[in-house]
Amino acid sequence: MDTLTAIGRWLAKQHVVTWCVHHEGELWCANAFYLFDAQNVALYLLTDDKTRHAQMSGACASVAGTVNGQPKTVARIRGVQFKGEIRRLEGQESDAARKAYLRRFPVARVLPAPVWEIRLDEIKFTDNTLGFGKKLHWLRDSRAQQA
């Protein structure tokens, strides 16, 4: 199994992302339920335009974040650190992402919030189930690497 496939399988089983945005010298983090898109290597989420993180993001912004489980033992720790770009989706792109998102999280039908995409450009996946401190690295613009 290649690196991106391994990372993607794990991301598809999780559902909460934490991401941080920087704007005019200020940092802010947020959490949201997400849907992983393996084809585009992206996370889709809903957040209102009035939130602090959405206002700081504007139409598009650089982000960094994490996705992690909550294991009770060190040997089972798994988690992703990433950097990428967040943008608010519009039109058909938004409609398609919302439809997929609502299949995973039907309760979100009551939320009128816009759909946002976090395009993952760099991923570091720590997977202690493969050995303590084992890391898998993936970069959008180059071949996947293992470290």
Swiss-Prot record:
The gene is yhbP. Belongs to the UPF0306 family. This is UPF0306 protein YhbP. NCBIfam families: PRK03467.1. The lineage of its organism: Bacteria, Pseudomonadati, Pseudomonadota, Gammaproteobacteria, Enterobacterales. InterPro entries: Split_barrel_FMN-bd (IPR012349), UPF0306 (IPR011194). It comes from Salmonella paratyphi A (strain ATCC 9150 / SARB42). It comes from the Bacteria.
